[in-house]
């Protein structure tokens, strides 16, 4: 039965008789080998349908259908552990482990998580979302089961993009040191989100081009049939390459492959052989991102993720903040040849495609290597250049030591464009940018800005670039508020806030709202409603800078303020509001103050607006919080 190639995403649920009978992998394991091809085809059809209903990660899931079927067929899950790296390719896994009918709720409020989550299923052995953690976690499980004298098979499924991170090799090195019983499946599709880059990607390509196969015949096992690409090769009774030519063997792993990751029959043979071996083993499988859906095979970057196919397109939307960043980057680079741009494998997501094409010699995609990205920038700055690092807030966490030790400690001139700051909606807690104020504002020499709109974002990026030292601009996911973006760039006064509204009332009482970043315009809306409803004056301030704060403005406003309110799309603990609290305490400014922001909990996925409502950070929620606080200030019961 050949692989089916689909050209459209179905709007009606496909007929999937074999798949419908699988609510547990044990039922899959009761099928004949010959039925697995049909299971894989039904699974691929169902993923096409489900992704169209819910949106979400797409190409990676289509690419691991046969691999997932083979893994659950050969290994005794959940007792045997499957550890998925990153997890955006886990939809087939979720469908085969009792969540078939729920898969259309993925990424929705109260629905399935976008990634494997331990609280969701016993089959989700490790919670993921960030890259390159699977081998470390899997090694920990293997060593724990060895210690408990209850061994099991632990299989880590890792993409070639994830293997570019140092953590993966740290874990492999340690696995060899412990002679751990661990299987690493290298899912090689030459992609992370963008195309894989660097020496490791070239190494994998070299292995592939040699066309050698592993003949797992050392103990009389059946010969593994070759991938069609290699039918001209005779049988080989040796490993893919000599140890000197194979990085994995040089580290100390037994290496098998590369195999066709879409040949489910061969994969079953391979995994059944490997179960009989011990020690650290690596299976190299070659897959195609978007397999089985023609548009995704042709354009895997665009089809990394998709939206709901029936979602209303609406009218024209403002530019995304990532696009504002990308336009600024090109404009700034045209004026200053010292500008170099760095991204850790997020060229498209960070809005850098245009820059990469326009200035290819000044663009550095370092793969999934956030620590390296930050220190690479530090080294460039040491030579008098002005590097700009484009990075998601949640991923900068991985380079925190480098931010402190390699950049800030030396007061190096590095600009950080921090994307996806705040809540990120359907991607859930693993991708939320909830902590960057807290982890950056404690670092000496750092300047931190947050724009109220897309035009101010452009001006802040220019300001950060002009500043001679480490500076960060953090901006949210998605579109701006719709203001006109000025082509001319101006440098903002460092640490200077902006009063956006002074709403006067008949009473002498005043509330001051200190708003940061994405919450400024929403706080203004709430303030206007409060002033009109309660006849109380309200001053709304766009703070602009988290560090340095506009301390003088706070002092001046405190003389007339009866209640301070801080508002931010960031964790309350350690955030911008905490910085205001600390300053007021040091200055002995004794005024009532409330801090509005994200609670001390990990927030599960929903739409961005739903999450803001749940946190009380929409206009209605901010208004309600101000009203409650004002009642307390006036001791009204």
Swiss-Prot record:
User: Where along the chain is thiamine diphosphate bound?
Assistant: 88, 129-131, 161-162, 189, 293, 370
> Per the record, what is one GO cellular component?
cytosol
Which CDD domains does the record cross-reference, listed alphabetically? TPP_DXS (cd02007), TPP_PYR_DXS_TK_like (cd07033)
Reaction catalysed by this chain? D-glyceraldehyde 3-phosphate + pyruvate + H(+) = 1-deoxy-D-xylulose 5-phosphate + CO2
| Family matches, as InterPro entries | Dxylulose-5-P_synthase (IPR005477), THDP-binding (IPR029061), Transketo_C/PFOR_II (IPR009014), Transketolase-like_Pyr-bd (IPR005475), Transketolase_BS (IPR020826), Transketolase_C (IPR033248)
Question: What Gene3D superfamilies would the database entry show?
Answer: 3.40.50.920, 3.40.50.970
Keyword Transferase in record:
yes
Q: What does this chain do?
A: Catalyzes the acyloin condensation reaction between C atoms 2 and 3 of pyruvate and glyceraldehyde 3-phosphate to yield 1-deoxy-D-xylulose-5-phosphate (DXP).
What the entry lists under HAMAP family is as follows: DXP_synth
Assembly, in brief, is:
Homodimer.
Descriptive protein name: 1-deoxy-D-xylulose-5-phosphate synthase
Organism the protein comes from: Acinetobacter baumannii (strain SDF)
User: Gene encoding it?
Assistant: dxs
């Amino acid at each position: 039965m050949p692989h089916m190639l689909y050209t459209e995403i179905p709007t009606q649920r496909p007929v999937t008789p074999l798949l419908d009978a699988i609510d547990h992998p044990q039922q899959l394991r009761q099928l004949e080998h010959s039925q697995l091809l049909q299971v894989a085809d039904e699974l691929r059809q169902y993923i096409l349908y489900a992704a169209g209903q819910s949106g979400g990660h797409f190409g990676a899931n289509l690419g691991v259908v046969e691999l997932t079927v083979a893994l659950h067929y050969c290994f005794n899950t959940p007792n045997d552990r499957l550890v998925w790296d990153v997890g955006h390719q886990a939809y087939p896994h979720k469908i085969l482990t009792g969540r078939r009918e729920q898969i259309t709720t993925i990424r929705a409020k109260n629905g399935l998580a976008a990634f494997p989550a331990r609280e969701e299923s016993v089959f989700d052995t490790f919670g993921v979302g960030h890259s390159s953690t699977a081998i470390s976690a899997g090694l920990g499980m293997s060593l724990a089961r060895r210690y408990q004298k209850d061994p099991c098979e632990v299989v880590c499924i890792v993409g070639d993009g994830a293997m570019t991170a140092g953590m993966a090799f740290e874990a492999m090195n340690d696995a060899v040191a412990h002679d751990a019983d661990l299987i690493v499946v290298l899912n090689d599709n030459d992609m992370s989100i963008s195309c894989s880059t660097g020496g490791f990607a070239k190494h994998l390509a070299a292995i592939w081009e040699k066309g050698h196969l592993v003949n797992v015949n050392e103990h009389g096992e059946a010969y593994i049939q070759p991938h069609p690409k290699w039918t001209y090769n005779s049988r080989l009774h040796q490993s893919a390459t000599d140890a000197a030519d194979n990085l994995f063997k040089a580290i100390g792993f037994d290496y098998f492959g590369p195999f066709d990751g879409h040949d489910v029959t061969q994969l079953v043979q391979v995994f059944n052989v490997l179960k009989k071996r011990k020690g650290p083993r690596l299976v190299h499988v070659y897959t195609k991102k978007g397999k089985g859906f023609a548009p995704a095979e042709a354009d895997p970057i665009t089809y990394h993720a998709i939206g709901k196919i029936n979602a209303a397109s609406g009218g024209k939307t403002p530019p995304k903040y990532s696009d504002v960043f990308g336009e600024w980057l090109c404009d700034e680079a045209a004026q200053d040849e010292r500008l170099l741009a760095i991204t850790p494998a997020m060229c498209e997501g960070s809005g850098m495609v245009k820059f990469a094409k326009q200035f290819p010699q000044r663009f550095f995609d370092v793969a999934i290597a956030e620590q390296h990205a930050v220190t690479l920038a530090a080294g460039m700055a040491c030579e008098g250049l002005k590097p700009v690092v484009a990075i998601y807030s949640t991923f900068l966490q991985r380079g925190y030591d480098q931010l402190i030790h390699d950049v800030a400690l030396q007061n190096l001139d590095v600009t950080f464009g921090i994307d996806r700051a705040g809540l990120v909606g359907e991607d859930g807690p693993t991708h939320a940018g909830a902590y960057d104020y807290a982890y950056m504002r404690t670092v000496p020499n750092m300047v931190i800005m947050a724009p109220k709109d897309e035009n101010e974002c452009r001006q802040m990026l220019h300001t950060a670039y002009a500043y001679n030292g480490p500076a960060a601009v953090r901006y949210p996911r998605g579109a701006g508020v719709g203001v006109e973006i000025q082509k001319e760039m101006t440098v903002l006064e460092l640490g200077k806030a902006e009063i956006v509204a002074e709403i006067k009332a008949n009473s002498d009482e005043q509330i001051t709202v200190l708003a940061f970043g994405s919450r400024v315009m929403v706080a203004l809306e709430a303030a206007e409603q409060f002033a009109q409803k309660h006849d109380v004056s309200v001053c709304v301030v766009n703070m602009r800078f988290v560090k340095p704060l506009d301390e003088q403005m706070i002092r001046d406003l405190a003389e007339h303020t009866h209640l301070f309110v801080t508002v931010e799309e960031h964790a309350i603990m350690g955030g911008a509001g905490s910085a205001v609290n600390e300053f007021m305490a040091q200055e002995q400014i004794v005024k009532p103050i409330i801090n509005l922001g994200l609670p001390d909990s990990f927030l599960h996925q929903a739409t961005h607006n739903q999450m803001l409502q749940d946190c009380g950070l929409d206009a209605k929620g901010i208004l309600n919080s101000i009203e409650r606080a004002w009642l307390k200030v006036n001791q009204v019961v």
